[in-house]
Amino acid sequence: GNWQETIPDIAQEIKIVNLTSEDKNRGLLDPYVIMKRTKDAESLAIDILTFLTGISSRDGEKFPVLRRAIRSVTQSKKRGLLRVIDKLRKDGSPVAENIADHIESMTDYDFAHLLFSDGDVEQSISLNRQLNIIQVADLVLPDKDTKFEEYTTMELLSVAMLIVISTFALDFIHSDRSIFKMVDLDEAWTFLQVAQGKALSNKLIRAGRSMNAAVYFVTQNSGDVDDEKMKNNIGLKFAFRSTDIKEIKNTLEFFGVDKEDEGNQKRLRDLENGQCLFQDLYGRVGVIQIHPVFSDLFHAFDTRPPVQTEEMR
């Protein structure tokens, strides 16, 4: 969106980081570039490379080799995911060569350059404004029904980038506790489907509670949040209109109300534009109407097609 143009009064407090596959953005999502603390960078590097390669920590043959290469990079002066490939090559064992080939095969994709650096990237993403928006262009997100084992390389890379950004958000949450912070994660269903994403989401919620921050997960279906611990830790719930009876029942169950009650089903099915089913911190459930008091904000975040927008005006 053109938020700086559509909300000129606070334009100076809006920072938009648009991550495209251009060379200037090379390595900006590399764990060793985006994370401030070396320990956090190493941990994220492990998560990303095990996610991309499918190597489990329970794999007694491959995981120790990969872990050793990552640790060696962490202890080096120049740090970046491309350096992990170099360390694996130096290892020389067939297992290390195989892992190196696997990782290297993913670096050929244009926007994969965002994830992989050789340790020479000097700039980094900073969140020094009141409203910081990180966008990644050309993401290829998997279909909701696609099994993890069937993800294409582009889909794996796309989800990996969202995991990096979400981890960066966790780092942001842990900043100054005296300042209230908000993190909004769009298309959250993509990483809620994978083990690393679920673990990260629970960390975000717990950190939000202790570090004076609100974390919003924007997802397509209530069923995307299937972790019971996570469900119990979500304080506020918003659900918009649905006509699919299965999704309606799942949503009502998520809100803790009778999913078989036809009145409840009708209430969710008949919601109008600007209305949603809402559950507050005390567990009370009801329909609320959202009134955008400031028209500037309404138009700034209006994502409808231009023709439809003009008709509504």
What annotation goes with each model-predicted range?
Residues 2-6, 224-229:
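Short, glycine/polar-rich helix-capping loops at beta-to-alpha or helix-loop-helix junctions
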Residues 15-18, 214-219, 237-241:
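Short hydrophobic alpha-helical runs that function as membrane-insertion/retention elements
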Residues 33-79, 225-313:
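P-loop NTPase motor core of the ASCE superfamily
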Residues 134, 221, 243:
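Residues in the short beta-alpha loop(s) of Rossmann-like NAD(P)-binding domains
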Residues 186-187, 210-213, 217-224:
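Conserved H-loop
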